[in-house]
């Protein structure tokens, strides 16, 4: 699956949906399973801002080898944006794939997206804006993060933070404490993985994950885009992409 050309006749299509409540028993806005076959999600909005965080899980999740193309879709006001990979049963996921094209993920706590357990994620022309916001923050924050053998590649994407203290000073302390705890439990000795605040984690990898990026933009010097190669997108082009997607993905 390489783009919005679709899932094929044996797959599932979810389109033109405005989702304001979790539609799965686990609290997800949309859940994709490997047994669904290739799935296309297009022209959808997942906005769970009216629901308390304790009743929610992911905006969009993919488990058990899920394969999906998500295009022209907005995920907003959720605690956890997009998760690909089943942490409980990682052996089911090595064939899982996710393509995000022309999408907006904004005003979330974390996972924009998170990839784990060997899954492969490709992001094209996406805007990731304001992760770690106080209203959706729980224990830690990050935007795109690959770990445990997973990979994320970002092409022509924008990573944008309006503020550094998105969840206030207390949120920053809680976030750092939880990252330190995570790294301690995983016996990760890289000090950057311990001490980088979540609001700075634009595109990162740890614990055997890999990330790469080309022609991406970040609006703050402190946003980390690991694995970026070549020239970056300019501010004018980034603002144009943001305006285009905001205008289309209402």
What residues fall within each predicted segment?
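Short N-terminal "domain-start" leader segments
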Residues: 211-213
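A short, exposed loop/beta-hairpin motif centered on an aromatic-Gly-Thr core
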Residues: 227-235
């Amino acid at each position: 699956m390489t783009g919005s050309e679709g899932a094929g006749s044996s797959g599932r299509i979810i389109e033109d949906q405005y989702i304001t409540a979790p539609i799965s028993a686990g609290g997800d806005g949309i859940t994709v399973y490997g047994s669904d076959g290739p799935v296309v999600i297009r022209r959808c909005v997942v906005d769970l801002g009216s629901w308390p965080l304790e009743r929610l899980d992911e905006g969009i999740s993919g488990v058990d080898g899920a394969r999906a193309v998500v295009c022209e879709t907005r995920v907003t006001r959720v605690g956890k944006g997009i998760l690909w990979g089943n942490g409980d049963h990682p052996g089911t996921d090595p064939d899982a794939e996710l393509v995000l094209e022309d999408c907006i993920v904004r005003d979330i706590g974390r996972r924009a997206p998170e990839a784990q357990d060997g899954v492969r994620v490709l992001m094209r022309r996406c805007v990731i804006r304001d992760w770690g916001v106080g209203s959706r923050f729980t224990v830690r924050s990050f935007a795109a993060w690959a770990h445990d053998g997973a990979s994320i590649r970002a092409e022509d994407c924008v990573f944008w933070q309006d503020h550094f203290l998105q969840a206030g000073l207390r949120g920053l302390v809680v976030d750092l404490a939880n990252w330190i705890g995570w790294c301690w439990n995983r016996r990760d000795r890289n000090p950057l993985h311990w001490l980088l605040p979540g609001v700075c984690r634009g595109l990162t990898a740890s614990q055997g994950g890999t990330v790469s990026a080309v022609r991406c933009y970040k609006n703050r010097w402190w946003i980390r885009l690991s694995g970026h190669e070549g020239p970056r997108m300019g501010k004018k082009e980034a603002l144009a992409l943001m305006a285009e997607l905001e205008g289309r993905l209402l």
